[in-house]
Regions:
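Single conserved hydrophobic/aromatic residue that forms the stacking wall/gate
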Residues: 1-14
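Non-heme di-metal
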Residues: 16-394
Length: 394
């Protein structure tokens, strides 16, 4: 923010020249777009342009959990009894999950939060990133409890070409936006002499395009790329093997559904005109969006082939997983206004038994035995009426 000296006093200018950690200018955030509006000042959560982001923040906080709440004593002995092909499936998926959440443990805060111009969305993203860190800690907790030497997992992630190939496709859009945004920050484009110029307007438009691609890629990451590994974790749980790990992954899946909704809300608000530039960009980028969905689906299919190269599991095989990925992809495309492209009925979930692991509410467990994952911390019911408890007597 810019300052000028008047006598012995320092006065704050009535405009903001660049990014600042605390904007002292009056900003009417309910009239700003989600990104690239004026920098934020007071963190206030009482007046929202989009209340849905505040609800998502509250829900994420209500779902707070720690991996240490789930016992993995049985998992360690279970792992020793797994056949070699089962160990391959379990360990390979664990490595991939570590990579994905290493990206998401940094991405939203590095890429999106600095350019966010709504307090409710900024707060939502901060909690999102924090929960992704919980996920990364959870994978470490699993690895330390299941393997005698955690290094045999961690130290081989970056030497696995299949994981590196997928990492590149996941991180490219993030990196493109972050690097371009930093160049924009360090340029003169935001200064008065350049604002509104052809060069400045063209630069910001292309920067917004990169932001769109980054958010769209994260939408696909949260909505598709986790689900092959999730399904495998749940399959072990269905077989009463590695149940603690399956329960932790179920908690992670519940969180990832919240993060998926965040990206869907952002994309749909762009599509519906939150920012006129982003509405136009969404339309221009539809062919790219379809192609990116297709690439992700194909990569997940190849991953399923790799997982089951030495044999399948009871209740799960390569063909079922590939059908499941197509079914999930259709749902994700429809949710952001795209037409489903895969020939599979929406009601025909190829792996219906995964649903109760993902939704949490379908799981009935004794509290003393395991983490009750349908429990919400700090939940408040606000639609209670005078006669709500009229039928109760003490």
């Amino acid at each position: 923010i810019g300052y000028r000296l008047v006598g012995s006093e320092m006065c704050i200018r009535d405009r903001v020249d660049s990014m600042t950690v605390f904007n002292t200018e009056e900003v009417e955030t309910t009239k700003q777009p989600m990104f690239f509006g004026k920098p934020l000042g007071i963190q206030r959560y009482d007046n929202y342009k989009y209340p849905v982001f505040e609800r998502l923040t509250t829900q994420q906080l209500g779902y707070f959990w720690r991996p240490e709440e789930v016992s993995l004593q049985k998992d360690r002995s279970d792992y020793q009894t797994l056949r070699p092909e089962q160990k391959h499936i379990f360990t390979s998926n664990l490595k991939y999950q570590v990579m994905l959440d290493s990206v998401q443990g940094r991405g939203p805060g590095m890429a999106f939060a600095p350019y966010c111009s709504l307090p409710e969305l900024e707060g939502c993203m901060k909690v999102w990133e924090f929960m992704e860190m919980i996920h990364s800690r959870s994978y470490t907790y699993i690895i330390k409890n299941v393997y005698s030497d955690p290094a045999e997992v961690f130290d081989t992630i970056l030497s696995d070409n299949r994981i590196l190939e997928r990492a590149q496709s996941v991180t490219q859009a993030y990196d493109d936006f972050i690097n371009s945004a930093h160049e924009y920050d360090q340029s003169n484009m935001w200064k008065d002499g350049w604002r509104g110029s052809y060069v400045s307007e063209t630069t910001i438009y292309e920067l917004k395009r990169k932001l769109f691609r980054a958010v769209a890629n994260v939408n696909i990451l949260e909505g598709i790329r986790f689900y092959v590994s999730f399904a495998c974790s749940f399959a072990f749980g269905e077989l009463k093997l590695m149940e603690g790990s399956a329960k932790i992954v179920s908690l992670i899946a519940r969180d990832e559904n919240q993060h998926l909704v965040i990206t869907q809300q952002i994309l749909n608000k762009w599509r519906n005109g939150d920012d006129p530039d982003m509405k136009k960009i969404f339309k221009e980028e539809e062919p790219w969006f379809y192609k990116t969905f297709e690439n992700a689906v194909n990569q997940e299919k190849l991953w399923s082939e790799y997982l089951f190269k030495n044999g399948s599991m009871i209740g799960l095989n390569e063909k079922l997983l590939q059908q499941y990925v197509e079914w999930i992809a259709n749902k994700r495309m429809k949710a952001v206004g795209l037409k489903p492209v895969y020939d599979i009925a929406q009601r025909a979930n190829p792996l219906p038994w995964t649903q109760h692991w993902i939704s949490s509410k379908g799981l009935q467990v004794a509290p003393q035995e395991t983490e009750v994952e349908s429990y919400v911390v700090g939940g408040i019911k606000q639609d209670v009426k005078k006669d709500t408890f009229s039928g109760f007597k003490l």
